[in-house]
């Protein structure tokens, strides 16, 4: 539970910083997958967005999240299309995709953990009322940002997890060795409850 706006601001700032780093790493993994499937320009775009998001840290805002979300969705749709159309993947492609899958699962689990902290902060501030001048500028800023950016972060995490699990399952049908995703499914259930 959150006891003050000052605490909420600190928790949210830390969560945004962690989230920006995690999402940046996830975007780089998606770029690696795109690369393995010869989607070079899409991979380059995602890497640029990942670098931008990583540099933002706790200054990340909704527009940054929207941009990387749009680019990730477009690239993931192309990845999905390429995988479905592929009759056979080369051994190099299978190795690259398998490595990406192995990197993806634990990173997504930690991203869900960050989203859980965000969810706790979002629900914790509902009982705090409005911050006052004595709470400080960071608290006043957090009071404006938490109700909008917090749910966007949670939604992005849920959508990314569902897309990722779907892509891993598709990779598996193409002979790529992928890790078990049951932990992701159960953590996603916790996040959405």
Predicted regions and their residues:
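Extended amphipathic alpha-helical interaction segments
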Residues: 63-191
